[in-house]
């Protein structure tokens, strides 16, 4: 009986190993030789930063703990990512750290202090961590960004005292309100929050990441993939010239999201973005979306060639840095989406990593 049990146990273990092996191997694949490419390799601007979307708006949570996050930071480091950006430290009632102020306002207590975790992992892997400000949701409800200033006055102070003074990896601030056009209260709100971020932290840099109101700027919850009324390059330039003129003293960089315009429009909009940033002494980044806006199911990892076209346009237009939204869901070998690990491999092939 004992021999039979041992035999069955060994058989079951062997079967489990056979099933698990392809899954585990897929997380550690070796990219194919770059010689298989029929386009010039490494012609795009490499991605050196990523958002961390742990207070998710419309993407499923992966429910990672410290071990999974540690592994993901290592995957990021292996392809040259040196900047990680918490996209928001809270959204409505869900928060990433035990904020005394926000808890008193009725927010829910988080089970883990993610800001501390991200700062520690950034320190471990030689990266810089940027803190995304709190999003109360009132701007999305009203269209008036000035509502976001009040809560963030307290959040900025809290975060700096808890993490900024503690970790050398704390490297900057992301002013998380997203706009695309002239928006009520936006200029003054960006100025106010940017100024406070700089004052409490001794001048650490700040950035914003707006979207371009192009043909793909549609409601994420809707079924439409495009719209007829899209901003022209000329109108985009006029409106963002006014915005940059009002915020450039306290906002150091602008990373326009690149997924709302078509691929044959990239150079026209990107060149305007770079011209405006240079005019006002700001850095011009691209937020290279690694999810696909062209698919009827929202959202899956992007086709590699679409990402390549966007990164190549950013390099042609002289952009300063490429960040992405976002590595962990759409590009990581351990993402819940199988396609993400394949995108990681194609990216490594293209850049010879």
Outline where the language-model segments fall.
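Glycan-processing catalytic domains of CAZymes
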Residues: 35-353
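C-terminal segment of N-terminal export signals and the immediately downstream linker at the start
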Residues: 1, 23-43
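Twin-arginine (Tat) signal peptide motif
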Residues: 1-8
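N-terminal export signals
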Residues: 8-28
